[in-house]
Amino acid sequence: MQQSTPYLSFRGIGKTFPGVKALTDISFDCYAGQVHALMGENGAGKSTLLKILSGNYAPTTGSVVINGQEMSFSDTTAALNAGVAIIYQELHLVPEMTVAENIYLGQLPHKGGIVNRSLLNYEAGLQLKHLGMDIDPDTPLKYLSIGQWQMVEIAKALARNAKIIAFDEPTSSLSAREIDNLFRVIRELRKEGRVILYVSHRMEEIFALSDAITVFKDGRYVRTFTDMQQVDHDALVQAMVGRDIGDIYGWQPRSYGEERLRLDAVKAPGVRTPISLAVRSGEIVGLFGLVGAGRSELMKGMFGGTQITAGQVYIDQQPIDIRKPSHAIAAGMMLCPEDRKAEGIIPVHSVRDNINISARRKHVLGGCVINNGWEENNADHHIRSLNIKTPGAEQLIMNLSGGNQQKAILGRWLSEEMKVILLDEPTRGIDVGAKHEIYNVIYALAAQGVAVLFASSDLPEVLGVADRIVVMREGEIAGELLHEQADERQALSLAMPKVSQAVA
């Protein structure tokens, strides 16, 4: 039940950076014993607000009110001492120190300048037990999993008696089991009467945890949903992006050209039976299937990431011998991989380098000198045309959001002579607004005659974007559906594993 008096209030919060107004007149309330979700596209202002709450930034206008008292934090330590803790996506812990040392860093119990390790480990053990964690407090942090690191960060907040705990995209690096454990802990913290702020683009998490949802757009407050029985996915999307859900996908019927890509009885590691399919010029074909269906494995084989063990790939009626990715690229077939951070981007290189790295070889001067003029113009062109949000082309790509990293990878392939593009989970980990931009790029590629084959486990996305849906099940094709005729029931029915009959 919502209390009459909020524990945390934002009153007219504004934040201006040189040339940029990040927040404008943000006002809303949060209550003790509730999980209050913050939603919005990248750049909507969620993280900026958390940094104001945590003392990283001072507001340009407005104030933060905690338990009826107007607060002004000079730094994060002041905020933490006032009971405010932020659990960021990138955890702020020291791997070489023990679990207990990390929990009580800055307030280690000591006497005469000597740390009382017995008391330290005892107190840390109590915090870990509170979270249901069976971890030896004397274990060096570096030996723990990311999920356990997160629990240590939460224990650190509890050790400082935090009454307000904010989570910023906390599940991005967690396994399903670790996510379940995190949700258990958050629900316990809610029962204890703490204010929980939760930032995520994953709507299934928002609906599973939240008692209220506040939506931001372009640095402004849009609305707060407090009746979770009356809010649904479509209403949230419309509040976040100002468009109906149908407009997010934006599919329209189009005409296709001749067959551009054909697989003839292709097998690859993880693909159980020979796969045969065709994609025409200008056609978008979606590959849908549950985990283990073989979608990613098929694409890796087609691109030369693994070896095709049988069958033949054809582009424009010509057989293509693909033994490594450079063979696929030379034939005009490009891949945006599922794991963009490990296989798509070069994290410690600039946006410019990541866009230009594939086509660079075609533009060198004298056969060996990088053509800086072409590289600068090409990168700037794709940054503008794809609306890549970055301070500049020299920004390290690892500092960009997932959506902007994906657009940079697309910019890389747009620099090549593309005939076929393979997209493996192209919008995973991307906010709704960036997804809309990715879909528009896909439609633009199709309009240029590119054959698009994209794999996704997001069924509404496949149904909303693809002209034709190929459903895979356990390494084989289970069936095909046309856009105008397909629905979720049909697609899921085809994707579900067959039930074996037990033999008596």
Curated annotation (Swiss-Prot):
Keywords: ATP-binding, Cell inner membrane, Cell membrane, Membrane, Nucleotide-binding, Repeat, Sugar transport, Translocase, Transport. Its main location: membrane. It is a peripheral membrane protein. InterPro entries: AAA+_ATPase, ABC_carbohydrate_import_ATPase, ABC_transporter-like_ATP-bd, ABC_transporter-like_CS, P-loop_NTPase. ATP binds at G40, E41, N42, G43, A44, G45, K46, S47. SMART domains: AAA (SM00382). It comes from the Bacteria. One of its GO terms (cellular component) is plasma membrane. PROSITE patterns: ABC_TRANSPORTER_1, ABC_TRANSPORTER_2, ARAG. Coiled coil: none annotated. It is found in: Cell inner membrane. Belongs to the ABC transporter superfamily. Arabinose importer (TC 3.A.1.2.2) family. Part of the ABC transporter complex AraFGH involved in arabinose import. Responsible for energy coupling to the transport system. The complex is composed of two ATP-binding proteins (AraG), two transmembrane proteins (AraH) and a solute-binding protein (AraF). This is Arabinose import ATP-binding protein AraG. It comes from Shigella dysenteriae serotype 1 (strain Sd197).
